[in-house]
């Protein structure tokens, strides 16, 4: 049986809850995109969805070398955006301490990072660079900070940015991949080798297809990435 693709247009055409696959009584959280290019794309989560999402993000953090003894400073935005609450849940799931900073308020970010001894920073790569410059301008010696790992995503970044972040903050900078339409961050992640993305294939089954024939391409060929995922609350099988 061939299944049709679900696209962002389908989510918008069925705004807000037309693609929900469970009763609203089973949906315990709702996230949505900003809606800057159209109606927001809305995704609901059951308790099982939240648990599996936290597990996927936990794997990313573990692959970065983080663990129970770490202090996570989560500087992604909290709210409808998935980054803040997603990273928060993943860090708590491995037993780490979490500072729910959210984005902005850079001066306080630096103060608490310094005073609390944050060891893992979660934010966008562009904000990490901004923080690095702000720390330098603050006059606080870099050696007084305990940061060792950065989990960066939610926007494109380059290897040059990675090297600049690592040099300025004295950390290892890792990419975390996701998309809000099928949960959020944690679909894929780097490991300590920093040489490509590992996918949580027991939760998100990837295929690369020819957009014209809709058939899988041969290894090494360019195509469109689609995911079939195990999310209970929303029907998007597979998502293109």
Walk through the language-model features, giving the residues of each.
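Active-site glycine/GP-rich loop and adjacent strand/helix microenvironment
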Residues: 94-240
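Short Gly/charged-rich anion-binding patches and loops
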Residues: 28, 56, 86, 108, ...
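Nucleotide 5′-phosphate-binding alpha/beta core
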Residues: 1-32, 37-55, 59-63, 68-69
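Short glycine-enriched loops at secondary-structure junctions
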Residues: 50, 77-79, 126-127
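Gly/Ser/Thr-rich beta-alpha loop segments that engage phosphate groups in nucleotides
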Residues: 20, 37-40, 79, 180-182, ...
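Acidic/glycine-enriched edge-of-secondary-structure segments
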Residues: 38-52, 88-98, 118-122
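Short, conserved acidic/polar surface loops in the N-terminal third of protein domains
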Residues: 42-46, 66, 83-86, 111, ...
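Conserved AMP-binding loop of ANL adenylate-forming enzymes
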Residues: 58, 62-98
């Amino acid at each position: 049986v061939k299944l049709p693709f679900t696209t962002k247009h389908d989510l918008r055409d069925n705004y807000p809850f037309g693609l929900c696959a469970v009763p609203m009584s089973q949906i315990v959280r709702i996230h949505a995109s900003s809606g800057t290019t159209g109606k927001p794309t809305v995704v609901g989560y059951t308790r099982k969805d939240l648990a599996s999402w936290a597990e996927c993000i936990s794997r990313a953090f573990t692959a970065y070398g983080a663990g129970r003894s770490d202090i996570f400073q989560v500087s992604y935005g909290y709210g409808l955006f998935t980054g803040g609450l997603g990273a928060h849940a993943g860090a708590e799931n491995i037993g780490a301490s979490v500072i729910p900073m959210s984005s902005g308020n850079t001066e306080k970010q630096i103060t608490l990072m310094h005073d609390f001894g944050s060891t893992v920073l979660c934010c966008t790569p562009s904000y990490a660079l901004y923080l690095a410059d702000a720390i330098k301008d603050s006059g606080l010696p870099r050696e007084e900070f305990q940061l060792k790992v950065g989990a960066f995503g939610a926007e494109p970044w380059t290897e040059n940015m990675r090297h600049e972040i690592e040099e300025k903050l004295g950390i290892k900078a890792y990419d975390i991949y996701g998309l809000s339409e099928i949960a959020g961050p944690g679909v894929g992640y780097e490991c300590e080798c920093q040489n490509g993305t590992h996918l949580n294939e027991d939760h998100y089954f990837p295929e690369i297809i020819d957009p014209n024939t809709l058939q899988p391409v041969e290894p090494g060929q360019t195509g469109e990435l689609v995911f079939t995922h195990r999310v209970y609350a929303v029907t998007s099988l597979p998502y293109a």
